UniProtKB/Swiss-Prot annotation:
The HSR domain is important for the nuclear body targeting as well as for the dimerization. Contains one Pro-Xaa-Val-Xaa-Leu (PxVxL) motif, which is required for interaction with chromoshadow domains. This motif requires additional residues -7, -6, +4 and +5 of the central Val which contact the chromoshadow domain. This is Nuclear autoantigen Sp-100. Transmembrane segments: none annotated. Its main location: nucleus. Together with PML, this tumor suppressor is a major constituent of the PML bodies, a subnuclear organelle involved in a large number of physiological processes including cell growth, differentiation and apoptosis. Functions as a transcriptional coactivator of ETS1 and ETS2. Under certain conditions, it may also act as a corepressor of ETS1 preventing its binding to DNA. Through the regulation of ETS1 it may play a role in angiogenesis, controlling endothelial cell motility and invasion. Through interaction with the MRN complex it may be involved in the regulation of telomeres lengthening. Residues 147-160, 250-264, 274-292 have a biased composition (Polar residues).
Length: 482
């Protein structure tokens, strides 16, 4: 009866531990969503892997890609996918997130994966993400009592004693952890803080071997010892950043350059820090500087490559388009050279300036409008006759002065064939109708009719037609008809 009562209680405890573990992991996953979205710089192969393993639907996959095509930042798209994973969160989600392909494609996920290992001090819950079975790792959290119950068919009393011993060990370990926190806080303020951190790193490296994590305790004392070793030094080595500060500034004078190089020596900084756990445990951090050999002042430093680690990548495509437009505008200006706008002089390049000045200095090379040959004038011409010879283009004739006085609509010009023309018709006959200025088109001995009118040789003809008198016979007939 005791054995039958113990097995349901152990199963409920196992379920409670599993639920507690998943809740802690989910809580830590929520806090790390922004960091994960910032670490994943491209959608491939992250979104494709989620779709292939049916963590997201095909429709949602297409929606995420459409948002990327609409110039939405990649980190916001990844954050939206992580919100979908949060709804279906379990250990398989973490296994898919930190698989080998993603770790190789996104190296920044290594630090985030290590932070999940610090959720529990013993780090046993996170080993399933590295390729093991999550269920087998969860069995380690149950304590040695579960292994005894599975190994012995009728060991109910052993199960109870083992579970009680496991609870007592947890109490001891919690007390030891509080004592270690106070000691670490005191050592962090003491001058020998670096030595203590180096000792903790060595102990942690010795305890973090796969053998110590994979072997199950065979008895209660072995379990207490293993748990104590894992909890006494939970600090782990984390390579945060390696910075190389180069001093490549050349100052005037040898003394200034020497002082500058002595102050700004190259250094490599390695930070040893511990991840923050959900239990509120803050461990000591230490930095060790390894100075390198100072470079001579006359040596040139190679250009350092900087990678933009900004979270917002919305400017990736739009900024590239703007830069291309600026480049094309600059190239176009360089190709066209300097120019004049509204009589505002712009500095010209030497090549353009010499060409422009040389062209302006040589009048023969300038392009200008070609003018036809001038019609010679007769200075001492006689305009006393009744008829004057006139010319308009290819047409030639004689102008009758008396008829010209009557008006412009009178046929006062007689051609060579004997045909009579008005001044406007004679202009059309000489193929100068486009000018529409017969006073300027028709000439007499080289002088235009306008000039002859101004000199008084010809009288300016009236523009109106002369009314012809009515026939008296027709007027009488009209009166009689009335």
């Amino acid at each position: 009866m005791e054995g039958s009562d113990g097995s349901p209680r152990m199963s409920t405890e196992q379920e409670n531990t599993e639920m507690h573990l998943i809740e802690c992991m989910l809580k830590h996953f929520k806090t790390q969503k922004v960091a994960i979205s910032n670490a994943i710089r491209s959608t491939f192969p992250f979104l494709e892997s989620l779709r292939d393993h049916e963590f997201i639907t095909g429709k949602m996959y297409e929606d995420l890609l459409d948002s990327c095509r609409s110039l939405v930042p990649v980190d916001k798209v990844i954050y939206r996918a992580l919100e979908e994973l949060e709804k279906k969160f379990d250990m398989t989600v973490l296994c898919e997130l930190f698989n080998e392909v993603n770790m190789e494609k996104y190296p920044d996920l290594n630090l985030i994966r290590r932070s999940f290992g610090c959720v529990f001090p013993n780090e046993l819950c996170f080993q399933g993400i590295d390729g093991g079975n999550p269920n087998s790792q969860l069995s380690l959290e149950q304590g040695p009592g579960a292994s005894y119950s599975q190994g012995s068919p009728n060991g109910s009393s052993l199960d109870l004693s083992a579970s009680e011993g496991w609870r007592s060990n947890d109490r001891r370990n919690s007390n030891l952890m509080q004592a270690n926190q106070t000691e670490n806080h005191q050592l962090a303020e003491s001058p020998g803080h670096l030595d203590s951190c180096e000792l903790q790193v060595q102990l942690n490296n010795r305890d973090a071997t796969p053998e110590s994590c994979s072997l199950l305790p065979q008895n209660e004392e072995r379990a207490v010892q293993l748990n104590y070793e894992l909890q006494i030094n939970p600090c782990f080595v984390q390579l945060v950043d390696v910075k190389k500060e180069n001093s490549s500034f050349s100052l005037a004078g040898n003394q200034q350059t020497r002082a500058r190089t002595n102050q700004n020596e190259d250094s490599e900084i390695i930070e040893l820090s511990s991840g923050d756990s959900d239990n509120g445990e803050n461990f000591s951090e230490a930095t060790t500087t390894v100075p390198s050999q100072p470079a001579p002042a006359y040596s040139r430093k190679p250009p350092t490559l900087r990678r933009d680690r900004g979270g917002d990548t919305s400017d990736t495509e739009s900024s590239i388009i703007i830069r291309r437009r600026k480049r094309t505008g600059r190239k176009k200006r360089e190709r066209l050279g300097s120019y004049l706008i509204r009589n505002i002089k712009i500095p010209m390049k030497p090549s353009w300036k010499t060409a422009f000045l040389a062209r302006s200095a040589n009048p023969s090379s300038q392009r200008r409008r070609k003018r036809g040959p001038r019609i010679p004038r007769e200075e001492n011409a006689d305009f006393g006759g009744a008829e004057l010879p006139v010319v308009c283009g290819n047409a030639q004739g004689f102008l009758d002065k008396e008829k010209f006085k009557q008006g412009i609509y009178v046929r006062s010009i007689r051609g060579k064939t004997g045909r009579l023309f008005t001044p406007m018709d004679f202009e059309i006959e000489g193929n100068c109708e486009k000018a529409k200025n017969w006073r300027q088109s028709i000439r007499c001995k080289g002088w235009t009719l306008r000039e002859l009118i101004q000199k008084g040789v010809l009288q300016d003809p009236p523009r109106k037609k002369k009314e012809t008198p009515r026939n008296p016979r027709q007027t009488r007939r009209q009166v009689n008809a009335l």
